[in-house]
Regions:
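Basic, nucleic-acid-binding surfaces and adjacent catalytic neighborhoods in DNA/RNA-processing proteins
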Residues: 5-130
Length: 130
């Protein structure tokens, strides 16, 4: 995943960045939980359209994608409800969540909000994510 690749895919897009991240044809492997965490880490609003992202935001986004996914893999993923891996172990990345599932909680002088976008829960900090 390179900055140029992502820029080329989204710079004319009217689609919001949260949906772009979930589109497996553009970037494979990002699910709903990780999309919220990645957008928070990169300080980008989930409602921002692809065409409105500046190159410095795309750079931050790609760095956040890499960091969040590497950390999640090292932690064995996120165990929500009854998921276990093939060897029976539970993932523990959920202990690293900054925003996902934390609606109403305060972080960095901001109250985490939850909205439903295209039928998916989206957690974000309106003050920090623009």
């Amino acid at each position: 995943l390179t900055n140029k690749y992502l820029f080329d895919k989204i710079h004319k897009s009217e689609v919001i960045i949260k949906q772009i991240l979930l589109n497996q044809k553009i970037i494979a492997g990002i699910g709903n939980i990780y999309a919220s965490e990645i957008l928070f880490a990169s300080r980008i609003s989930p409602f921002k359209k692809g065409k409105d992202l500046k190159m410095k935001e795309i750079n931050r986004l790609i760095l956040s994608i890499r960091l969040i996914l590497i950390k999640a893999i090292r932690c064995g993923g996120s165990t929500i409800r009854n998921y276990v891996s093939s060897d029976g172990t539970l993932g523990n990345f959920q202990s690293n969540f900054k925003v996902y599932g934390k609606s109403g909680k305060k972080i960095a002088n901001c109250i985490i909000k939850k909205d439903i976008l295209y039928g998916r829960s989206t957690f974000y900090c309106p003050k920090l994510q623009r």
